[in-house]
Amino acid sequence: MGTKESTQRRAQRVRRQIRKVAGERPRLSVHRTSKNIYVQVIDDAKGHTIAAASTLEKDLKGSLKTGADTAAAAAIGKLIAERATKAGVKEVVFDRGPYIYHGRVKALAEAAREGGLSF
């Protein structure tokens, strides 16, 4: 089994567990690359993205040193919490995908919790 296949299997395993516990709550999905981090609040029942944020946004790009550190992830966490709250979402299910809960993923999650999202 190659790296790509094992990554996809890990992500599917996490999402399967999320579907069991989610109920009606939307999913806070994280995607991480070596240079940036992206996050979306997704309503799986309707198939719509409620809110999204990334380190590629123009207003954030100038204020961040890089898009690939924990400070950038924390800024994105606060931003997604603000946007989700504005859209009327208070409770979400955290979808870390194939990434372990450590470093940038953990910083994003903690900042989103501080911003008002509960999961």
UniProtKB/Swiss-Prot annotation:
SUPFAM superfamilies on file: Translational machinery components
One BP term from GO: translation
GO MF annotation: an example: 5S rRNA binding
GO cellular component: cytosolic large ribosomal subunit
Pfam families on file: Ribosomal_L18p (PF00861)
Alphabetical list of CDD domains matching this protein: Ribosomal_L18_L5e
Keywords on record: Ribonucleoprotein, Ribosomal protein, RNA-binding, rRNA-binding
Subunit organization: Part of the 50S ribosomal subunit; part of the 5S rRNA/L5/L18/L25 subcomplex. Contacts the 5S and 23S rRNAs.
NCBIfam families xref list: L18_bact
Family under the similarity heading: Belongs to the universal ribosomal protein uL18 family.
PANTHER family referenced in this protein's UniProt entry, alphabetically: 39S RIBOSOMAL PROTEIN L18, MITOCHONDRIAL (PTHR12899), LARGE RIBOSOMAL SUBUNIT PROTEIN UL18M (PTHR12899:SF3)
Function: This is one of the proteins that bind and probably mediate the attachment of the 5S RNA into the large ribosomal subunit, where it forms part of the central protuberance.
Name of the featured protein: Large ribosomal subunit protein uL18
Species: Mesorhizobium japonicum (strain LMG 29417 / CECT 9101 / MAFF 303099) (Mesorhizobium loti (strain MAFF 303099))
UniProt gene name: rplR
